């Protein structure tokens, strides 16, 4: 694999791994505030970030040794309102800056596996941002967000509210490849 795409995969793995941990902590905070659906949303999206990290990791399975992952992260956790704003900022960075650049570099370098991994994550992060914005609107009005079941594809991390699709619109995985967060 070409070095720039390889480093982008390492960085994306680091960023998605950090997002997973951050969202687990944010979920715990929401639970403490009795915002059960916000907590469930953070848990579901944390799981999707875990899937993204795993996809990037699999593209790097040939590596052996220690590597530095340079990735954007957000700090300063607080109440659920602040945590949702931090989550939206992180997702926005991935949508507007990180993944579009990584996709173009992988495409230019003809690294098809990396490109696919980046494209799957990019498509999913847009849904994460929309779900977090919906939750923030509810929290800002003093109530928990109204959410149905949240589905996460175990292959690409695609996340949606509602019924499980027969086929994942991102990666083509079948219905039984989804995990439901109720």
Q: At which residue positions do the language-model features occur?
A:
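Non-heme di-metal
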Residues: 1-182
């Amino acid at each position: 694999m070409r070095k720039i795409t390889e480093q982008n995969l390492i960085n994306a793995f680091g960023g998605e791994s950090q997002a997973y941990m951050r969202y687990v902590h944010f979920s715990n905070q929401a639970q403490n505030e009795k915002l059960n659906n916000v907590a469930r949303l953070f848990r579901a999206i944390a799981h999707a970030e875990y899937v993204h990290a795993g996809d990037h990791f699999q593209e790097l399975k040939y590596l052996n040794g220690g590597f530095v992952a340079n990735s954007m992260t957000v700090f300063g956790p607080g109440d659920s309102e602040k945590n949702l704003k931090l989550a939206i900022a992180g997702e926005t960075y991935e949508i507007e800056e990180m993944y579009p650049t990584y996709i173009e570099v992988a495409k230019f370098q003809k690294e098809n596996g990396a490109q696919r991994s980046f494209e799957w994550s990019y498509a999913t992060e847009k849904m994460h941002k929309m779900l977090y914005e919906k939750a923030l609107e509810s929290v800002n009005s003093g109530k928990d967000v109204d959410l149905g079941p949240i589905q996460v594809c175990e292959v690409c991390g695609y996340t949606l509210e509602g019924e499980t699709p027969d086929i994942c619109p991102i990666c083509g995985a079948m219905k039984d490849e989804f995990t439901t967060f109720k």
